[in-house]
């Protein structure tokens, strides 16, 4: 089979939902086993490589940091889709997907893409997975220094040889609508470092934020979370002075900047927008904009076991 035309994206190109990678992050999923038709998430992962198969290791991380995982094999050009209600019902959180070999070691396989179709009573939206390239060796090469005799391996988001692309340090939500006409905005933040053998997250993350009106005036706020923060923005969340509805009144928009207070831990996330009014037409979702990258590597400890 002929290769795709054009020039391949370099492994050093930063994490994006518009490229393929060796590690994917789905920033949000949820489901309700008692009402799966109305509240559920369908995730899809595609192996875009034309000749090589790959093992994909899924880590489902709940908002309170508990981890459940499983693996499957994707042949060349294969797409795998699953309803979350069938495998991890009644949980919300994020999903980490890692390309591995049959021994359970992460490998360079910058050919994975993914999408999540998320629906509930208020909205039905598509959210692409964030892709992180492996920056080492040719395709199929295990992560440097990893041993099949080890029970764990460390994955570094370092943008250096032997690691994956860096995580964002500062992120932004753009075009936040006013609540006055029924528009609602949900902010999702994720911390993807930590130990995936027991409980993910790299400690409680203190986040500093700025909410701007459309005249460049800002109000600051603070929030904290461990693995995932998912809240609808209103006059109490986050707490600003003046309140959200004053900063973004009827007919106006604003935006938000967020970053970890220690300046080193990475953030990922997404924003969802919908309208609660009858026949409200506004709905959509996208991953947060990345403003800066971390100055130091964030690491994740992953279990090693064969497929």
What are the roles of these predicted feature ranges?
Residues 2-307:
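Gly/Pro-rich, tryptophan- and cysteine-flecked surface segments typical
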